[in-house]
Amino acid sequence: MRSTKVIHIVGCHAEGEVGDVIVGGVAPPPGETVWEQSRFIANDETLRNFVLNEPRGGVFRHVNLLVPPKDPRAQMGFIIMEPADTPPMSGSNSICVSTVLLDSGIIAMQEPVTHMVLEAPGGIIEVEAECRNGKAERISVRNVPSFADRLDAPLDITGLGTIMVDTAYGGDSFVIVDAAQIGMKIEPGQARELAEIGVKITKAANEQLGFRHPERDWRHISFCQITEPVTREGDVLTGVNTVAIRPAKLDRSPTGTGCSARMAVLHAKGQMKAGERFIGKSVLGTEFHCRLDKVLELGGKPAISPIISGRAWVTGTSQLMLDPSDPFPHGYRLSDTWPRDE
């Protein structure tokens, strides 16, 4: 075999959502901070295209690049690559990265609990891993500060009319809409329709509402989170959600950043307080167990510090190669499986 590059990957998924991890073969990108490094990856696109596009990737795949941390508090940094974005943070991907670091021995596992500090592009995250028999069985992540932006904002959608939405940030930016407003239910059989209408709502929200992070250069809404009503038992709230990810796929997990954004909205509306828990359920029925740990402030905005908890499993190892005669060094996308990102 001949190859001009070899990239070593450990496959992983968190509650159904793929979050593979590059563990070797890629040098750290330029940048003084992990955020700057992630902007290089986003703008350059060479690595993104190689690992995400067909024939080596697919629209279902997210890939994380391990990098040396820039913050002295952190043991490892990571950069998240999604089909259409290189985001500040991801709950499912941070759970995958933590699991791979421990299960593969890159960071030494301590049973029954391992504590780690990781550096995402969006900031420092604290990780607590419940470990047994050489396996990280559950990962809890203190997410970056999360906040509600707009509440009960009118949004005009072609074919639907005016719907009421919230916008919020939970490590990434969301427009949040109740499924009943768009005449849908969150179930696997409606996945294609949910993804398509979700991307349509995201586009409209960017055009009509917009978003700007108070501290980071993040000036767009990334995702539409479609929700069903929250139920409550004591101090535990439970809610089903699904997140439409551009170009048009559904997150298979409950979306950790989405759960964080939803908790921020619930808190802003007086429906959730510090110390209460939230169980987010995905389109597959998998769960993230979350907690609104405390209330704080971010850039003059009321915010929360959320903790998200879930499980991940290693699915295999692989090496991606590039033969010098390969006509597709950057891969390709066809609209039969890669929906048009209009």
Swiss-Prot record:
- Report which superkingdom the organism of origin falls in: Bacteria
Q: Which Gene3D superfamilies match?
A: Diaminopimelate Epimerase, Chain A, domain 1 (3.10.310.10)
Q: Which residues form a coiled coil?
A: none
> Annotated Gene Ontology MF terms?
4-hydroxyproline epimerase activity; trans-L-3-hydroxyproline dehydratase activity
Q: Which InterPro entries match?
A: Pro_racemase_fam
- Pfam families in UniProt: Pro_racemase
Q: Which family does it belong to?
A: Belongs to the proline racemase family.
The protein's name in its UniProt record: Uncharacterized protein BOV_0353
Q: What is the lineage of its organism?
A: Bacteria, Pseudomonadati, Pseudomonadota, Alphaproteobacteria, Hyphomicrobiales
